[in-house]
Amino acid sequence: MSISKISLIDFNDTKLRKDDSAKTISYFCKIRPVKIDSSVVSELRDISELNKGANVRICLHDSPLSKHHDMVILERKDKYYRPHKHKDKGEAFHIIDGKMAIFIFDEDGSILDSTVLLQGDIYRIEENQYHSVMPVTNIVIYHENKPGPFLGDKDSVFPSWAPDGNNYNKTQNYISYLNSYIK
């Protein structure tokens, strides 16, 4: 038996802590080392389905205050991911399953780069760079890493040129605009 093995379905509170205050279903790993294998990736899908298609993440770090954040994240195509930037944090994405578009914007909202990441692809974003992700497949699962700590509402800066998601028509028009850049 491996001490690094975790399970979301056979939940063990000595290995994982569920964060009920998070915006998405989130778990923090309490053990070191920690191993994420294909069975855990499959459990991400199961947890999402059991929760009406919710996004789910496993944080490989033990707390929002950790100096380095590693997360395995499941996101769904039917949701809006507002462009944002992190003032002093770069980040990297590594696709585990599915496809995901990434958009990089200048300060005025013009698209500087758009690309579709496939399974195994890696993409790094510099600090203070507006960006957005958009799942291309119904579900995308990826590994994201960036510096901590998580600063709550101060962690991300949202631009005025991107809809906040509260107006359905504006949001759908913006999503259609971004979709026109996906090749």
Predicted regions and their residues:
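Short, surface-exposed charged micro-motifs
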Residues: 72, 92, 132
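Short acidic-glycine-tyrosine-enriched beta hairpin
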Residues: 106-128
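Anionic, Ser/Thr-rich low-complexity intrinsically disordered regions
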Residues: 155-158, 164-168
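A short, N-terminal "cap"/entry segment at the start of jelly-roll beta-barrel domains
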Residues: 1-68, 115, 161, 170-183
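Conserved short histidine dyad/triad with adjacent acidic residue
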Residues: 71-87
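A short hydrophobic beta-strand segment most commonly corresponding to one strand
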Residues: 92, 137-156
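Glycine- and acidic-residue-biased ligand/ion/polar-headgroup-sensing regions
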Residues: 76-77, 88-106
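Short beta-strand His + acidic residue motifs that chelate non-heme Fe in jelly-roll/DSBH
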Residues: 82-83, 102-104, 123-125, 131-136, ...
